[in-house]
Amino acid sequence: MEGDGMSATDKIKEADWRLFRSRLPIWQEAYMERLNREYIALLSGTGPASEKFWELERRMREDKRRGGVVMRMSRSNMELNLLSLLSDGVISIAELDGFSEELREKLALVLRDHRDWDHGNS
C-alpha cells in the first residue's frame, strides 16, 4: 500500500462494495430477528422478573453495539465490517457467495489466523 499509489479504498472492488451495501440491511434484519427470539426466550423463561429484566437490559446494551445491529458504512471499513459480522456470528462464510474470490480468500485467511491465535496455534 505504501508507495504503490493506491489507498485502501482503491483495493475494494466496486462490485464487492455494491454487494456489501445491498446485503448489509438484510443481514442486520435477520440478526435482529434472531436477537428478538433470544430475548423472548429469556423473558419467557423461569426465574424472578427482576433477574430477567436486568439480564435483558445487559444483553441489549451489548448487542446494540454489534455490527449486526449498527455499522458505520464506509468503503474503507468494508473488510473490517465483514470480519466483524463473521466473528460475531451475524453471517457465515457461505453468505459471502457472490463476493470476489480474492475478498473471500482474504477474509477466510484472516479468520483462520484469528482462530489459530485464539487457540495458541501458530
Write out the residue ranges for each language-model feature:
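Acidic, Ser/Pro/Thr-rich low-complexity regulatory regions
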Residues: 2-122
